[in-house]
Amino acid sequence: MRESQHNGPEPRLGLTFSENPDGTVSWHQPVSDQFVDPSGRFATGGLAVLVDSGLGAENHRRRPSGKWTVTTELRLDLIGAPREGSTGLGIRADHLGHDGHCLTTRGEVVDDDGEVIASGLVKTMEFAAGVDAEGYDDEPPWPSALEPGTLAEVLCLTLSERGDGDGGRVVEGVIAPEPTLANPLGNLHGGVFAAAAEVVGAAVFSHERDVSSSALDVRYVRQIPLVQPVRVRAEVLHDGRSWGISQVTTRDERGRVCAVATVTVYGRR
């Protein structure tokens, strides 16, 4: 059996997969420092690549021959952080179907006791492939190459506060053009943007909960080039006593929106 040549964000975050005798695929992600956000809380965004890759793969394997798929929407709802001592997470996927435009799969992130800690949903569109679409289907399982560090460090993400925007505090993040954060087409991996958006979007709020945020909702408008640093900007849409909502965007060099996300945070300030 040939060895995998994949060196993307999945192995960088420790994600691995295995093929089961019944044709299904099992995913595993270790619970380590990549689930720590800059404030020291459990980082909800640490689940984003697992959800994007695990659920997106279910859509991808059902695409028409000769086509490639790209994530257009990703939804992640946190139920609770893994129990103390939990060592790994998996995903249970339920493919819902194809409406003629998008393939849709929902699923649950479970800990090593089988307890559900989050739910997710991924929609993808297919398009004429600019790569060897069928060749990637034969990619063998890759070994974990877990990069040490917190989620921001693994994502090569630095944060800075830029003062008040129209709705309040603004936080900006910069993702360095690290090649292992790319998708097979060479652009920023959708799960990486989702993870970074959650980190930056949650950083505009202070609260007492032990998780960074409760929900992440992402729309991908166009490819996010990774030939230079990627800038991610979060600003407040609502900052109440019990919960808040931030909007996170990234733009290309022409100022066009590439992706937009909302991050929802519950917890009293």
State each model region's role.
Residues 39-42, 55-90, 201-231:
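Hydrophobic beta-strand-centered segment that forms part of the acyl-chain substrate-binding groove
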Residues 24-26, 73, 88-90, 104, ...:
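Intrinsic-disorder/low-complexity, polar/charged segments enriched in Ser/Thr/Lys/Arg/Asp/Glu/Gln
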Residues 29, 76-77, 107, 173-175, ...:
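Preference for bulky hydrophobic residues occupying beta-strand positions
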